[in-house]
């Protein structure tokens, strides 16, 4: 019994009892009054908190950050409010225990403890109320130096990132341009560069990322910069000039990095307010774009081309995207997957989109179907192709300056996949189609064509080939062009492109009444027997086939046909007379065919301005051509079986509209005479000397100023001399002139290709130094040639490195050749080099590197 009494907390009972009657705080007696007071003050506190939260929200909308003391006060209010709710739950129980008019309780200890909590909560609420007045509730957020970007994958980008980063960290590089075709990974590369600045936070004050977009406004760029700098939101209502001033005042005190993603045209950084990057301020600017054009205006210190992935890198990205689980679901799928990946030609965007589409395909039938779709003219129908690839790439097309340039670009899609298109041939097509100026003078259509090709290459819509005389299209860009050309897939029947497919005969699925352009290049077609009404057909491309015969009725109903290309059909020996029905025809290419004569019906082709008969190895005569085709502007007879004689030369003089001419000549006297007829000589672009025997041949650099191609085949010529002063007509050997010091700068400035085969007589070809811009040189089967360039003669002509612009050099079957050129061991621009069967040529010369850096 005594032990039980000892367990009673007599001290608390005593304290509580005293508190009931004698304590100043009267926790029990004042319980109800304190609860009422707590309820009132708590409501006031919550209202104060809500008012403060509204103020904080307004300031945060301005880009400011809540003060820590404000955040702490609000947090304390939340805690007090939670305690208040707990007290309210026990209120009825505790107030129900009160007795003796509230001076005592049925459970004094419980009531005492509860009353104490009420009092302390009330005191804390009153304390918080006394501190609720804040003059300032938020402050400016410290600007993070780098905002890290999320990156999907960096497969194949490591080397490019390292190269770009190394270049950017060079003190001499203040502005860096990353250019490449759409979808190639420029934004990902820029994001990698952005994230690398995390490692250099101490060296730069701020890294700013701006998305420029195609239809950018200066204010839009300014707003992104100001937002990144966390300046007060009052700037939103400011003028463009005021915003520029705010940006300039902020950045001129900082070592900043500006990353501009996706530039489409020149951006005036001065108008935006961005200080120019200098060595003094340490600033850097990097921008990405699809065309090299902008980098010129933005004054980039360095340009880096972002190229497509290598085959191995492309496969790795595709494999990761598809996932190994799918690839291992059937033993044949990996091989099929590699075929699908190869169709993307290393374009990361295509690899990711097509890879994601195939990531759920577990059967070989699905993979075979994917390959069939990608190989078909309806490749744009592949899942995700239109909305995620073609629409992205279309921005590059939309940025082209005008409709004519867009038409020129779309025309390139008529050629087979990976087909290398001759620039000159492409321009001829464009001119005859009417896309560009038909004027063929020095400042006319041809130059305009090269300008357009350059623009398309810089926009990464065309790719310059290894030999710069050719261009080609990336597979996905070609798909985009075909998609646009068919009105975004809505009118596929208006364009028929089956180039590269082995169809052997004209496809039956061509809707001849609707189709506008038909391209059946390299399709192995052997004969054409159909005869359909082709009311809208304007372009018919049939080169690189095996045509033997064209039916009589084929050309009967093609009133709008403008371009007809039958070239490189070696077995085609005649054309039907019904070709006379092609009343709109302007372009006819019969090069590399077995045509023996032109049909009489051609005299009705009054609009024909272009006729190509080059490499026509069976052509017998062109008698009467001036009367038959009086409006010809271009006549090409390079490597033709028809050589210029007095009769043909007379005919050519009567062709008043002739502006471009290529010829084959086998008589030195004819060569001399034609050079004396200024109008004919100045129009010659290609000259083939064949089966010619003469003690010497004189070439006038003035008369033949437009010469671009020269071939010397099976000739016995002891000496080739230059005539470089047209008025004095003085013949000179190479040793008599030094073009680098001559005021008249003699030489064949346009000559880019020379082919010499079976030349007997000369021991050297030093006169080639007069072709300062030579790009391609082929020399073979010439038994007496000992040097390409003789040291004594060459040094008298120029002190510069020979063949500085040469891209292709092929030398073979020259048994006496001992030296190529005395003053070089590199070809700075060489892309193709081959030496064979030249036993006396020193091995170190025969195997010298193509590029100086090698």
Curated annotation (Swiss-Prot):
Keywords on this record? ATP-binding, Coiled coil, Leucine-rich repeat, Nucleotide-binding, Plant defense, Repeat
Task: Map the LRR repeats onto residue numbers.
Answer: 514-535, 536-557, 560-582, 584-605, 607-629, 631-652
Where does the NB-ARC domain start and stop, copy by copy? 138-441
Q: Which InterPro entries match?
A: Apaf_helical (IPR042197), LRR_dom_sf (IPR032675), LRR_R13L4/SHOC2-like (IPR055414), NB-ARC (IPR002182), P-loop_NTPase (IPR027417), Plant_NBS-LRR (IPR050905), WH-like_DNA-bd_sf (IPR036388)
Which top-level group of life is the source organism from?
Eukaryota
Query: Does the keyword Repeat belong to this entry?
Result: yes
Gene Ontology molecular functions: ADP binding; ATP binding
Q: Which residues form the signal peptide?
A: none
What's noted about domains in the record? The LRR repeats probably act as specificity determinant of pathogen recognition.
Similarity annotation: Belongs to the disease resistance NB-LRR family.
The record describes the protein's role as: Probable disease resistance protein.
Q: What is this protein called?
A: Probable disease resistance protein At1g51480
């Amino acid at each position: 019994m005594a032990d039980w009494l000892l367990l009673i907390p007599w001290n608390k009972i005593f304290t509580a009892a005293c508190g009931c009657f004698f304590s100043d705080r009267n926790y029990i007696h004042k319980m109800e009054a304190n609860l009422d007071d707590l309820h009132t003050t708590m409501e006031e506190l919550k209202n104060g908190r809500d008012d403060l939260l509204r103020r904080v929200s307004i300031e945060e909308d301005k880009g400011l950050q809540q003060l820590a003391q404000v955040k702490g006060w609000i947090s304390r209010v939340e805690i007090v409010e939670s305690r208040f709710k707990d007290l309210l739950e026990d209120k009825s129980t505790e107030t129900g225990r009160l007795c003796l008019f509230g001076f005592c309780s049925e459970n004094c200890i419980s009531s005492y403890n509860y009353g104490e909590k009420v009092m302390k909560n009330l005191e804390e609420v009153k304390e918080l109320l006394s501190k609720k007045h804040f003059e300032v509730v938020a402050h400016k957020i410290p600007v993070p130096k780098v905002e890290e970007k999320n990156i999907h994958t960096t497969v194949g980008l490591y080397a490019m990132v390292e190269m770009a980063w190394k270049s950017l960290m060079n003190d001499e590089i203040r502005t860096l341009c990353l250019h490449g075709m759409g979808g190639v990974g420029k934004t990902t590369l820029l994001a990698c560069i952005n994230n690398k600045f995390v490692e250099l936070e101490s060296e730069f004050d701020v890294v700013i990322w701006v998305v420029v977009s195609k239809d950018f406004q200066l204010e839009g760029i300014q707003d992104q910069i100001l937002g990144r700098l966390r300046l007060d939101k009052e700037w939103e209502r400011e003028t463009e000039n005021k915003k520029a001033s705010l940006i300039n005042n902020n950045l001129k005190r900082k070592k900043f990095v500006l990353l501009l993603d996706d530039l489409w045209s020149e951006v005036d950084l001065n108008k935006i307010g961005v200080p120019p990057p200098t060595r003094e301020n340490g600033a850097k600017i990097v921008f990405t774009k699809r065309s090299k054009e902008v980098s010129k205006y933005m004054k980039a210190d360095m340009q880096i081309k972002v190229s497509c992935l290598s085959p191995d890198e492309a496969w790795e990205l595709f494999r990761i995207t598809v996932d190994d689980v799918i690839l291992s679901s059937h033993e044949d799928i990996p091989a099929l997957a590699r075929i699908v990946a190869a169709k993307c030609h290393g374009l990361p965007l295509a690899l990711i989109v097509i890879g994601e589409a195939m990531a759920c395909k577990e059967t070989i039938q699905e993979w075979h179907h994917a390959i069939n779709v990608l190989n078909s003219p309806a490749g744009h129908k592949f899942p995700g192709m239109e909305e995620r690839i073609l629409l992205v790439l279309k921005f590059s097309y939309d940025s082209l300056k005008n409709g004519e340039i867009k038409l020129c670009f779309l025309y390139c899609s008529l050629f087979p996949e990976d087909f290398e298109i001759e620039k000159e041939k492409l321009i001829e097509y464009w001119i005859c189609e009417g896309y560009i100026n038909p004027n063929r003078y020095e400042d006319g259509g041809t130059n305009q064509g090269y300008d357009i090709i350059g623009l398309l290459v810089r926009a990464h819509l065309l790719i310059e080939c290894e030999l710069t005389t050719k261009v080609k299209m990336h597979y996905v860009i070609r798909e985009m062009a075909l998609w646009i050309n068919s009105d975004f897939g809505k009118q596929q029947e208006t364009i028929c492109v089956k180039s590269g497919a082995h169809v052997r005969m004209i496809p039956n699925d061509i809707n001849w009444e609707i189709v506008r352009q038909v391209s059946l290049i390299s399709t192995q077609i052997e004969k054409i027997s159909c005869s359909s009404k082709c009311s809208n057909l304007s372009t018919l491309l049939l080169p690189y086939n095996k045509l033997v015969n064209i039916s009589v009725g084929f050309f009967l109903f093609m009133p709008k046909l403008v371009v007809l290309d039958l070239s490189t059909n070696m077995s085609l020996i005649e054309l039907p007379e019904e070709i006379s029905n092609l009343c709109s025809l302007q372009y006819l290419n019969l090069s590399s065919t077995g045509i023996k004569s032109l049909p009489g019906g051609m005299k009705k082709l009054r609009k024909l301005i272009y006729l190509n008969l080059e490499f026509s190895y069976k052509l017998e005569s062109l008698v009467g051509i001036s009367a038959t085709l009086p409006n010809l502007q271009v006549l090409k007879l390079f490597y033709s079986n028809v050589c210029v004689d007095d009769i043909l030369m007379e005919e050519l003089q009567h062709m008043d509209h002739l502006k471009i001419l290529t010829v084959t000549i086998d008589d030195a006297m004819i060569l001399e005479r034609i050079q004396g007829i200024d109008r004919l000589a100045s129009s010659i672009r290609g000259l083939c000397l064949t089966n010619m025997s003469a003690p010497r041949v004189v070439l006038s650099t003035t008369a033949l100023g437009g010469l671009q191609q020269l071939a010397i085949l099976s000739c016995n010529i002891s000496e080739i001399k230059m005539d470089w002063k047209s008025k004095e007509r003085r013949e000179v050997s190479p040793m008599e002139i030094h073009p680098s010091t001559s005021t008249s700068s003699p030489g064949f400035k346009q000559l880019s290709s020379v082919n010499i085969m079976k030349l007997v007589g000369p021991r050297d070809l030093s006169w080639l130094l007069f072709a300062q811009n030579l790009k391609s040189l082929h020399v073979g089967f010439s038994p007496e040639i000992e040097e390409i360039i003789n040291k004594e003669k060459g040094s008298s002509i120029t002190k510069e490195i020979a063949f500085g612009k040469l891209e292709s050099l092929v030398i073979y079957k020259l048994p006496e050749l001992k030296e190529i050129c005395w003053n070089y061991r590199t070809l700075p621009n060489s892309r193709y080099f081959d030496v064979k069967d030249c036993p006396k040529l020193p091995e170190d010369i025969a195997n010298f590197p193509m590029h100086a850096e090698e």
